[in-house]
C-alpha cells in the first residue's frame, strides 16, 4: 500500500518547480494583457534572447534543422533556420495563451482550415477519428477551432509537477474547448479514448516524439528514429481512421491541413500492422515538416545520434 507521502502530488514543490510555474503564469499574463502587436514583439524578442543565451538548446535545434535541411549544423542557412525556430516557438506560446481571449468570429477568420471534409466524411462512419499531429505551428489553435465549431475533441496530457502547473494547462485547454485526459500508468487512458471514439469524438495526439524509448522505429529524413505506437494502436483497435493534421503558423494566424485517412494493406497481425501504420504516419510527418522546417517545435534531440545535448523540457501538458 502506498502512503500519501509517496505520491507525486503530495511532495512539496522544489524551487525550480515554483519558478517554472510562475514563469508560465507570467507568460500567460503578458500574452493576455499586452496589445497584440506589442505582445508578439515581446515574445519574439524573448525567443531571440533564448537563441543567443541557451547554447546547448541552440545546438540541439540546429542539429534537428540540419537533418531536415540536409545541411551541416554550422551552415549559415541552418543558423538562420535555428534562429527562426526559436522565434516561432516563442510565438507559439504567445498565441496559445492569446487565442483564449479572442472572439470566435475573429479567430475563425484567422485560422485557415484546409480539407476539413476529410474529417467530416470519416465521422460519418460513427467511429470517431484519431488526429495525429507533429509539434508544428500551434496545435492549441487547431483544437480550439474544432471545439468552437461544433466538434467534440479530446487530447491526452502528461501529468506534471507541480500539480498547479498541470491544473493551469488543464484549465487553459478546457477553456479552448478540448477535453483533456490525464496520462496515467494505470492503463485506463486507452480505454477512455476508445470510449470517446465509439461516441464519435476526435482524439488529437501530438505524436512525432517517443517518450518511452519503446516506440516504433521509422525513417525520417534519411535516419532512423522512434515515434509512439499509440496513434496507430488506437486507430487499429478502435476502428477509427487515422489522419495527419499538421498546423502551420501564418503571419496573422494559422493553417491546419487535414490529410486523408491513412490506408494500407493489413496483415492481421496487430504488431506488424501498428508498425506499418506508424511508418505511414511518419512519412506524412516528414512531408509536413519539410514544407516548413522552422515551424517544427522540436527542441529535444530528434534522432539518437544527437546524444544528450541540452534541450528544453517537453511542452507542459501538451496533448499527445
Can you describe what each PLM-predicted range is?
Residues 1-130, 137, 259, 274, ...:
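Membrane-proximal helical "anchor" segments flanking the first transmembrane region
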Residues 2-16, 50, 71, 83, ...:
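Non-catalytic C-terminal accessory region of glycerolipid acyltransferases
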Residues 18-21, 60, 141, 164, ...:
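Generic alpha-helical secondary structure signal
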Residues 26, 38, 61, 142, ...:
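Hydrophobic alpha-helical segments typical of transmembrane helices
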Residues 59, 162-163, 224-228:
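Active-site metal-coordination segments of metallo-dependent hydrolases
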Residues 64, 140, 208:
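Acidic active-site catalytic centers that drive phospho-/nucleotidyl reactions
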Residues 82-83, 87-201:
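Conserved nucleotide-cofactor-binding alpha/beta core module
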